[in-house]
Amino acid sequence: MPEILKIKPTRMELLKLKRRVKLAERGHKLLKEKQDALIMEFFTIYDEALSLRRELIRKMEEAFNSLRRAQVDVGALRLKEIAIGVKPNKEIEIKTRNIMGVRVPLIEVPELKRKASERGYAFVSTTSTVDMAAEKFEEVLELAIRLAEVEESLKRLGKEIEKTKRRVNALEYIIIPRMENTIKFIEQHLDEMERENFFRLKRVKAILEARQSM
């Protein structure tokens, strides 16, 4: 006999257990639907992450090419001095949003691309190549922040998918089968009890009839 629950083999427990099986099956169905929806959402965001990563690599190549041109134009030392003088960019705000019950980051990014006059360095000390390099790296920063948001979302969704999968499997392969095995055991036990009672009553009836015929 497969593993069963440790409960009294009574009709009352049998009825309770049948109700529990129905609830477990309903829960399994809902969890499976949630798992499927999470997987679909995961791959949608995964495609976005791949696209962002490709775009980020392309933008980084452009940015470093621009940086090399600026370095040739004004020299490495002067470029470093200009970089030190750049004003910090605006702060980002990190919130969260809900995807199928999973809290994922939502990064609100202000406009990071700035005019040369907003960066804090003097016009006389720079050239168009320096401005171009700064602009390219601002684009890189925007993409990097967006990619960080998407990858963290993937990480959290992945954890929730694994968690949901474990619950689905536990219901499907352990909890529900164990309850069903217990139901079969109780039904067999009750059937056996009924048969025993039937034969006992039959014997009693036969004894009584025999006494009456004496």
Swiss-Prot record:
Pfam short name (any one): ATP-synt_D
Keyword Transmembrane helix: no
Any one GO MF annotation of this record: proton-transporting ATP synthase activity, rotational mechanism
Superkingdom, taxonomy of origin: Archaea
Keywords from the named record: ATP synthesis, Cell membrane, Hydrogen ion transport, Ion transport, Membrane, Transport
This protein's record includes keyword DNA-binding: no
Membrane protein topology class: Peripheral membrane protein
A biological process term (GO) from this entry: proton motive force-driven plasma membrane ATP synthesis
Compartments where located: Cell membrane
GO CC term, one of those recorded: plasma membrane
Main location: membrane
Database matches in HAMAP family: ATP_synth_D_arch (MF_00271)
Functional note: Component of the A-type ATP synthase that produces ATP from ADP in the presence of a proton gradient across the membrane.
Quaternary structure and partners: Has multiple subunits with at least A(3), B(3), C, D, E, F, H, I and proteolipid K(x).
Family per record: Belongs to the V-ATPase D subunit family.
Listed name of the protein: A-type ATP synthase subunit D
Gene label: atpD
